[in-house]
A protein has these predicted regions:
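Phosphate-binding/catalytic loop of phosphoryl-transfer enzymes
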Residues: 76, 84-87, 93, 97-165
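Short glycine-aspartate micro-motif
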Residues: 2-6, 62, 126-130
């Protein structure tokens, strides 16, 4: 089985995939910069227990992160729990995605993962939208080519800013 971990600014999403590629469980944890590798291991073990799976059956893991301060601890936790390090999405990882930008290394791991996932499910051209703490919009053309995209404040960030800066707009 494959354990996929996506560290976002607000939540850490984890998904367990069977050998057939089917999603077995999807769970979320709070993104907490203070957690140690041991605490992350306990959190992950609890998720496996909650969903009635054995972490010992996981053969591989992959890590995607937009929170660099947590990468080391998560890599350490996954290595300790599963007995080998995760594949970390980032520059140098072969995804089959052609990035048509001047500085390819500036494309976030989350954007690469969104694009690759979309290409596995749909035929290009594709527009991806990921609505998290930040909203990202990506454009993928024929030939598995990432053309570029937009990075915008997420819905909650926008609502918080509006309620703070606009006198007659209350927080909702």
């Amino acid at each position: 089985m494959l354990l996929a971990v996506d560290i976002g600014n607000s939540t850490i999403s984890t998904g367990l995939f069977g050998l057939d590629g089917e999603l077995r469980f999807l769970a979320s944890l709070d993104t907490d910069y203070r957690k140690t590798a041991d605490q992350i291991c306990v959190d992950l073990m609890n998720l496996f227990q909650l969903y009635h799976f054995r972490y010992e059956d996981v053969t591989d893991s992959i890590l995607c992160s937009v929170v660099p301060p947590l990468n080391f601890m998560m890599e350490k936790a996954l290595t300790r729990l599963l007995g080998k390090p995760p594949v970390v999405v980032g520059p140098g990882v072969k995804t089959g995605l052609n990035i048509r930008l001047a500085v390819q290394s500036q494309v976030g791991a989350d954007i690469v993962a969104d694009a690759v996932s979309a290409l596995e499910q749909f035929t290009a051209p594709i527009i991806t939208i990921d609505m998290g703490t930040a909203t990202t919009i990506g454009v993928i053309s024929e030939g598995r080519t990432y053309e570029g995209g937009l990075l915008l404040p997420g819905v909650n960030v926008s609502l918080e800013a509006l309620s703070r800066r606009a006198a007659q707009l209350p927080a909702i």
